Amino acid sequence: MATNYIFVTGGVVSSLGKGIAAASLAAILEARGLNVTIMKLDPYINVDPGTMSPTQHGEVFVTQDGAETDLDLGHYERFIRTKMTKRNNFTTGKIYSEVLRKERRGDYLGATIQVIPHITNEIKDRVIAGAQGHDVVIVEVGGTVGDIESLPFLEALRQLAVQVGREHTLFMHLTLVPYIPTAGEVKTKPTQHSVKELLSIGIQPDVLICRSDRMIPPNERAKIALFCNVAERAVISLKDVNSIYQIPALLKSQGLDDFVCERFRLTCPEADLTEWEQVLYKQANPVGEVTIGMVGKYTELPDAYKSVNEALKHAGLTNRLSVSIKYIDSQDVETKGVEVLKGVDGILVPGGFGYRGVEGKIRTAQYARENKIPYLGICLGMQIALIEYARNVAGLTKANSSEFDKDCEQPVVALITEWQDAEGNTEVRTDESDLGGTMRLGAQQCHLVSGSRARELYGKETIEERHRHRYEVNNTLLPQIEKAGLKVTGLSADKKLVEIIEVPNHPWFVACQFHPEFTSTPRDGHPLFAGFVKAAYENHKKSVK
């Protein structure tokens, strides 16, 4: 069967939820038995989001094969079973870098390099490559139609529609249909102008997803269809909802999946959304609630911890609990003391980079350990837990990470480049080296120690989790820390690197070097998060007695 392409664009304003809409449609099509994948084309000049500020761009989502990608790929994996790869996300910067590399290599035989055809051809080639092996590929274009940055992508998709045939392509455009209280009605003019902008570059949308705070009345949908040259049944109303997991059912109720299948002449069974109905039932009927304190340095933008936020909610679903997240700036712990941590049922310290707020995180780990509060540390959250234990229990009073103090006397955490690879080679880095591409990235094996809490939670000896870090636990100083009682319960594939630590004689204190949040989904909560939230609930019940 030929691959079919759905191109998703957005107009009027940004942040309409193109990624959620694309993922929701993909979930319905997958529920009809189709093999679906989703791609994200980002129009910024950065080669990838790896070195971008989390407070500007949100989290960096790491794929199984180690690509540092846009957070929308996290949404995609949470909605569909297909795992994303480095083929599922690319940027303007990556496209231009590749074209310039080919030009320097002489691939273009001295031709003048231009946006059309060289840049657009590179975009088309990557979209086609990413679509291989799938029945349907949904391609989301970042940004807003009318922005100069996205023009090469839109032109490439216009060309691709001609190349593969319009019978195998569908353009889906998200727009804003605002409600004006003084007029007492929704206004369609912004949508009309957004479609006009698309038409000016040669793209006629086939489906319009109309975002609003309410359902669009039938007469307004008919008006939009008439002025925008779209079938009335293809004007879909997408109102604000309490949970993003309601959106697949909302789109299906308006026949979007039927329209898509008819357009592509696909014969497939009705979508079975039973799993999503179960998710929504659990979400609407919790038996209790917990408050998790998330202590980090990017707390002013919750999207910086998007996958962690979602994983906590998924763990709530697994345990039939409502999870409330209290964001705590780690610098507040330094300046105001541990008082800011009181009233939470569990404490989570997520990943991060840089020295700012680190001492606050270390005090947080100490507070959780000494007060028997359930603690989950992720990546840096594991490293600071190790530093805290080394300082306050193992007697290594000057313990630190070489990330925060290059000259520290007791570097219990050290640069990844100080470790030898399988061939005995050590990578050399200087102050001039690029930050990009210097980390342990992607899915890697981990061996769990028998009898440990981690082994009990996972229910198996070997697991695979995703990494994104430069620093490792220093094996030279580790024996002294273990002698003081800290348990190493997870080791890398070669059993040389620490992956999980646990504090004994504590209700629940687990920290991991990897990022478990990247593999959590609403249908399959992650064992570590599920165990953590359950322990937090047990702590909550004690506190209210």
Swiss-Prot record:
The keyword Magnesium applies. This is CTP synthase. Residues 1-266 are annotated as: Amidoligase domain. NCBIfam families: PRK05380.1 (NF003792), PyrG (TIGR00337). Residues 291-542 form the Glutamine amidotransferase type-1 domain. Signal peptide: none annotated. UTP binds at residues 14, 187-192, 223. Its EC number is 6.3.4.2. One of its GO terms (biological process) is 'de novo' CTP biosynthetic process. Catalyzes the ATP-dependent amination of UTP to CTP with either L-glutamine or ammonia as the source of nitrogen. Regulates intracellular CTP levels through interactions with the four ribonucleotide triphosphates. GO terms for molecular function: ATP binding; CTP synthase activity; glutaminase activity; identical protein binding; metal ion binding. Mg(2+) binds at residues 72, 140. Pathway: Pyrimidine metabolism; CTP biosynthesis via de novo pathway; CTP from UDP: step 2/2. It catalyses: UTP + L-glutamine + ATP + H2O = CTP + L-glutamate + ADP + phosphate + 2 H(+); L-glutamine + H2O = L-glutamate + NH4(+); UTP + NH4(+) + ATP = CTP + ADP + phosphate + 2 H(+). One of its GO terms (cellular component) is cytosol. The active site is at 379 (nucleophile), 515, 517. L-glutamine binds at residues 352, 380-383, 403, 470. SUPFAM superfamilies: Class I glutamine amidotransferase-like, P-loop containing nucleoside triphosphate hydrolases.
